[in-house]
């Protein structure tokens, strides 16, 4: 694989690894180049990002590399987070919210087991919009956080109580459930945006 393609692959790996990051050893195993070459490539990418005036940077935290935004751009990100146009929820957030609404209280790992993918970003979005809350800690190893819906969730979706949620289908078809969640929560989003 040529040098530029390797840098592109590494950038993609950094992107999909998210907040957890990825260490040079794992990148080395995936790309089949030495750890030293990976470190050299990352240093070169850091310089490329600076030269090009990119809005992201590569940082090393606890021996793992991450893509992060530049600290000097924080005021713009704050504006985005508080702008009215950002009131809609992503499909991932809607799915996560539906799971919490029907199965609460439950842990992040239980949600991820149901969805089949990570849900940290969706949970953070829902927490920041105050649609879910931390509802204590589960018993067991590590005492993970339990999540439940909030009063704001009920208000946002025009529900008097959780019992007003439609009954989930017995034989759940995941694609059909996604469409129903979008329809239910999408209508409530439209009503609150009017």
Curated annotation (Swiss-Prot):
Any one Gene Ontology biological process term? cell division
Keyword set for this entry? Cell cycle, Cell division, Chromosome partition, Cytoplasm
Q: Where in the cell is it found?
A: Cytoplasm
Which Pfam families is this protein grouped with?
Answer: SMC_ScpB
Under the heading InterPro entries, the entry gives: ScpB_csome_segregation (IPR005234), WH-like_DNA-bd_sf (IPR036388), WH_DNA-bd_sf (IPR036390)
Q: Does the keyword Cell cycle apply?
A: yes
**SUPFAM superfamilies xrefs:** Winged helix' DNA-binding domain
One Gene Ontology cellular component term attached to this UniProt record is:
cytoplasm
- Which top-rank group of organisms is this from? Bacteria
Instruction: Decide whether keyword Cytoplasm is in the record.
Output: yes
Q: How does it assemble?
A: Homodimer. Homodimerization may be required to stabilize the binding of ScpA to the Smc head domains. Component of a cohesin-like complex composed of ScpA, ScpB and the Smc homodimer, in which ScpA and ScpB bind to the head domain of Smc. The presence of the three proteins is required for the association of the complex with DNA.
Q: Which family does the UniProt entry place this protein in?
A: Belongs to the ScpB family.
Write out the function statement from the record.
Answer: Participates in chromosomal partition during cell division. May act via the formation of a condensin-like complex containing Smc and ScpA that pull DNA away from mid-cell into both cell halves.
Q: What is this protein called?
A: Segregation and condensation protein B
Its gene is scpB
